[in-house]
């Protein structure tokens, strides 16, 4: 943010996937103490309804005049009502706090599993890298067979983005399924 200020550049942050409590703060950039000029958001903003939005500082917003920008999912009354309800729910229930607390708990449990090389997470955005003997796709398929939906994003990496209302008990169940899957792959 200082670099942008020093060089008279705008700082734009994309919070489409990471915004609205996912990373343990209302917006992910808030974890870093930076001040963007424009923030884009979608996905969690609508609670399942199609909507996208941007927020801008007052100074930057002056540049937006009627017809100077467009949107695919902006402004629909039903989606806007859903977004307002969703934002109230996220903030009133402190789902950012839950994401941080449960995300830290989940990561600590995952780090203890066999063959885990590294767990990377921020809130409830969680990646697990396994050693070279365990394939991410194999873990994904084994977990799916055990009714846990995850994704593989590399040869040895899985990613999980649980709901913001997930509990520690539900994370324990997920860890048990992943551990069972890993053990089945060792054979």
Predicted regions and their residues:
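Conserved N-terminal phosphate-binding loop of PLP-dependent enzymes in the Aspartate aminotransferase
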Residues: 1-187
